[in-house]
Structures are given as C-alpha cells and as structure tokens.
C-alpha cells in the first residue's frame, strides 16, 4: 500500500552563500509504504520535470499552474494542494505505479503492480531459496505446569497457588507437598463425577 501526502511547504535550507530573499520553496513529500514513513523534500521544478517525463507514457491529471496570485502564503497553499492532488491522481489513474514516480519518491523495493500477490513480492526479500521454507517463531512448551508445580528451593509454601487450587478443586495441599525439594510432582486432581 502506498500513500503520498504533502503536509507542508517552506523555504529551502539556506546555503552559506544564499540570501534569504533568493531561497526556493521546498515541498515536504511524506511517503507511507508498507508501514514505513519517510520524507522527501522536492521543489516545484522537480515536480514539473517528473510531469514532463511521464505525461506521454502514463495517464496523468492536469499539472498545477506555476502562475499564482500575488498572495504568497495563500498561493503556496494552493500549489501544495494541487501538487498533492496531482501525485495522488497519478496513483489513482494508473494500474501500475510509474517507475519514474517511484524514483521521485525514493522508493526502491515496491511492486509496480498493486494487484500483485503479497507472497510473490515477499519472496524477493527472503534469503536464498525460500519458496519451500516456512518461517515461524520457535514454540516454547512446558513438560510440567510451572504454576501448579513450582520447583523453587524456597522453604515457604506458595500461599496463592495453594489457595487457588483449594478454591477451585476443594482439596488442600500440605506445605511439604506444595514446595518439593528435588522433583516436582503435580498435585493430584479430584476424580471426575
């Protein structure tokens, strides 16, 4: 899944020889792909260059005009909204995500066909010949229930476990059987009615 937003626009980071009056405006392009988010700073001219490259190869919406009203902040906000709608329009109109757009968004490992199977795309990231391997986490099991039979060397009985067992099964455990010294033997359960 690919989501693209342009949340803000602001002046480009100033270089040592650059005056604040001549700074260019940079659009902060926020990309969310497979749960990972990154930001790409792009100037209007870079958006326009992308448009020139892909307009004959793919379906693209109208590109936002460079001419804006004299009100600088309102015009920048209109341009930001227009560029965001333009990028989202490219994603919506095309069945495959254009390679040029992926480069523009700095995405390397993204399936260009959004209808591609997730399993097929995951295989390229797994090491070696993993098509027949199944990956799962190790399973932890206990031979003896650690809550019923605690092989602790403590001399004091476990009052909580004894109380729960007595309340649930209506039998009592003597302190000697509750905390065995060497081997752990589970408490006997009452016979089934």
Curated annotation (Swiss-Prot):
GO cellular component: cytoplasmic vesicle membrane
UniProt KW Calcium keyword: no
Annotated CDD domains: PX_SNX22 (cd06880)
Organism for this UniProt entry: Homo sapiens (Human)
Record family assignment: Belongs to the sorting nexin family.
The protein's role, per its UniProt record: May be involved in several stages of intracellular trafficking. Interacts with membranes containing phosphatidylinositol 3-phosphate (PtdIns(3P)).
Stored PROSITE patterns: PX (PS50195)
Cellular location(s): Cytoplasmic vesicle membrane
Annotated gene: SNX22
Sequence segments annotated as region (Disordered): 1-21
An example Gene Ontology molecular-function term: phosphatidylinositol phosphate binding
Pfam families assigned: PX
Residues annotated as binding a 1,2-diacyl-sn-glycero-3-phospho-(1D-myo-inositol-3-phosphate): 43, 45, 66, 79
Coiled-coil regions listed: none
Protein name in the entry: Sorting nexin-22
UniProt keyword list: Cytoplasmic vesicle, Lipid-binding, Membrane, Protein transport, Transport
Main location: membrane
SUBUNIT field: (Microbial infection) Interacts with P.falciparum (strain 3D7) CK1.
Comment text on domains: The PX domain mediates specific binding to membranes enriched in phosphatidylinositol 3-phosphate (PtdIns(P3)).
Membrane topology classification: Peripheral membrane protein
Residue ranges of every copy of the PX domain listed in the record: 1-118
């Amino acid at each position: 899944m690919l989501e693209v937003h342009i949340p803000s626009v602001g002046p480009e980071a100033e270089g040592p020889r650059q005056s604040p009056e001549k700074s260019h405006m940079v659009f902060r392009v926020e990309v969310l792909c497979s749960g990972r988010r990154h930001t790409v700073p792009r100037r209007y001219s870079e958006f326009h260059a992308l448009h020139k490259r892909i307009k004959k190869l793919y379906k693209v919406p109208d590109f936002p005009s460079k001419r804006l009203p004299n009100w600088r902040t309102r015009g920048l906000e209109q341009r930001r909204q227009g560029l965001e709608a333009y990028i989202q329009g490219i994603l919506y109109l095309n069945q495959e995500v254009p390679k040029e757009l992926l480069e523009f968004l700095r995405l390397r490992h993204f399936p260009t066909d959004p209808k591609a199977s997730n399993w097929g795309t995951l295989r390229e990231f797994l090491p070696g010949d993993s098509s027949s391997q199944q990956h799962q986490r190790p399973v932890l099991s206990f031979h003896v229930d650690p809550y019923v039979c605690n092989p602790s060397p403590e001399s004091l009985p476990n009052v909580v476990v004894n109380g729960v067992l007595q309340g649930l099964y209506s039998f009592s455990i003597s302190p000697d059987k509750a905390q065995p010294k060497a081997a752990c033997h589970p408490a006997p359960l009452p016979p089934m009615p």
